[in-house]
Structures are given as structure tokens and as C-alpha cells.
């Protein structure tokens, strides 16, 4: 049992196993990448116990200058450093986006290295292709953290619910907009003020919060879940998407009068004719 079609490869990746391992590389050293390094060090003993041997971060790929960092010796600006080292069997991708992450992940998988990522844009756009590539080269392409953050949903879908037919998915998958809508409702706050607070707290991007407030983040997440549910790649560009940018306090009050609340809901439905819809 497991996922049908190309997304069965995700189950095969999980079952193939990538442990035990000794040395890994991190691609990208922003908030997520630095967090991965911190967790690897802080939880080194428990990771070693579960993996069967110690896990060490040998390289960090980032084009910026970290010469003043205590970990300066780990940094490289070239993907070739990772690809030319036979000790590196697992790569953690935290670059984000697709411009650099996608070709780098392709090269890692083609070289037989397993990749773990939380990059929802890359998974939503190229997931089926990268899963097939991983299978071809006996590697694993794992993306549990791309939806739900620390809340497991992908593994339960393809393992715990392997005997079930998933015909519908519906839920709140973007925490930033949920935080903003809650603020707007409880504190009678306008959109701009709620967004400013979300940005100050680090929930929303300061320069361009569009991924959250315009619904693109939620769109990518439901594309991933829909793909796993139906076994075929669902492209985010084919999913009608609307965010919360136009929601006003008046809208929220009108919903309250109907004993309702405004939420950004991502959904997937399978029709009786075998067709599917998502939004």
C-alpha cells in the first residue's frame, strides 16, 4: 500500500532509509539553516542514539561572507565542494525559492545524495520530478517540513493512512494570516496594523509579505497535499488563489453577525468522475 502514481516514490524514499550517516551538508545559512546547525549540535546525543552513529555538519553552502563566524571553516561558496566529497551522503536544503535550490538539489540527487527540505515552493513546483530523480539514483527526497512546520501531516498521509482513500482536505495551513485575522477580530484592528505587528514579530516578511497575505504560501502547501492525495502532480499555478489583503474590519464584523469567522482555508476535493479541484 501507499501513494499511487509518481508520489508513491515518497513512500519508497521513506522506506529506503538514509541512516546511519555521519556527515551532512547544509545549503543556505539563513534562519532555517542556522537553526538546523543549532539543533544538530544541541541534540547531538539523541540524534547519534537514533541514527546509530554521530552526525556531523561538515559543510555549509552560502555565497555570503562568514569569515568572522566561529564556524568559518565549515563554509563554502561552491556546490562542487559538497558534490566532490564522498563522505557527504545527506544534504539539507534551506536556501528557499527555486532559482538556486532547484538546480543544486537536482545535482545532489543525481549524485546519489539524499536531500531533506522544507522548501514548499520547490516541492510544489518540481516535487514529482525530484522524487523520480531520487528513485532513479537510489536516494531519498524528503519534505515533511514543507507543510505544517513541526506538525507531521505528510508522513501520516502516506503511512498511517495508507489503507485510506483521501477524497477531501480542508484546513488552515498559513499561520501568519491566521494570526492576523485573529488580531483583526479580537482587537478591532485593521489589516495594515495587523500586518505590521506580524512583521515586527517575524511572522511575515518585511520587504514582501505577499507569499502569506496573497495566499501563495497556502496555495503551494495545498498543491503538495493534493498531489500526495491523488498521486498526480498538482501545479500551484493551476489552483485559484485569493489571500486576505482585501479583508476589512467591516467584513469581520459582518461574519460575526452570522456567527461565523473569516479564515484563509486551503482545500482539495476529489469529484465522483475522478476529477479534482483545489483552492
Regions found by a protein language model. Give the residues of each.
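A short hydrophobic/small-residue beta-strand
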Residues: 114-116
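N-terminal glycine-/serine-/threonine-rich beta1-alpha1-beta2 phosphate-ribose binding loop
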Residues: 17, 21-111
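Predominant activation on well-ordered alpha-helical scaffold segments within soluble catalytic domains
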Residues: 33, 37-41, 131, 154-158, ...
Amino acid at each position: 500500500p501507499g501513494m499511487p502514481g509518481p508520489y508513491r516514490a515518497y513512500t519508497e524514499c521513506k522506506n529506503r532509509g538514509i541512516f546511519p550517516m555521519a556527515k551532512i551538508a547544509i545549503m543556505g545559512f539563513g534562519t532555517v539553516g542556522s537553526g538546523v546547525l543549532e539543533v544538530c549540535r544541541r541534540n547531538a546525543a539523541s540524534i547519534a542514539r537514533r541514527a546509530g552513529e554521530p552526525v556531523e555538519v561538515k559543510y555549509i553552502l552560502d555565497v555570503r561572507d562568514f569569515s568572522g563566524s566561529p564556524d568559518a571553516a565549515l563554509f563554502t561558496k561552491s556546490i562542487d565542494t559538497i558534490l566532490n566529497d564522498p563522505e557527504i551522503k545527506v544534504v539539507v536544503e534551506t536556501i528557499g525559492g527555486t532559482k538556486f535550490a532547484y538546480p543544486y538539489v537536482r545535482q545532489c540527487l543525481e549524485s546519489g545524495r539524499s536531500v531533506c527540505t522544507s522548501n514548499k515552493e520547490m516541492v510544489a513546483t518540481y516535487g514529482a520530478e525530484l522524487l523520480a530523480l531520487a528513485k532513479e539514483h537510489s536516494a531519498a527526497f524528503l519534505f515533511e517540513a514543507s507543510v505544517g512546520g513541526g506538525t507531521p501531516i505528510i508522513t501520516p498521509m502516506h503511512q498511517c493512512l495508507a489503507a485510506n482513500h483521501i477524497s477531501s482536505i480542508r484546513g488552515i495551513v498559513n499561520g501568519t494570516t491566521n494570526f492576523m485575522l485573529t488580531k483583526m477580530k479580537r482587537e478591532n484592528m485593521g489589516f495594515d496594523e495587523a500586518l505590521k505587528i506580524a512583521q515586527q514579530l517575524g511572522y511575515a516578511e518585511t520587504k514582501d509579505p505577499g507569499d502569506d497575505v496573497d495566499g501563495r504560501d497556502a496555495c503551494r502547501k495545498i498543491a503538495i497535499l493534493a498531489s500526495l492525495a491523488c498521486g498526480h502532480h498538482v501545479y500551484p499555478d493551476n489552483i485559484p488563489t485569493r489571500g486576505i489583503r482585501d479583508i476589512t474590519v467591516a467584513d469581520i464584523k459582518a461574519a460575526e453577525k452570522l456567527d461565523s469567522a473569516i479564515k484563509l482555508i486551503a482545500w482539495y476535493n476529489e469529484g465522483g468522475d475522478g476529477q479534482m479541484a483545489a483552492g
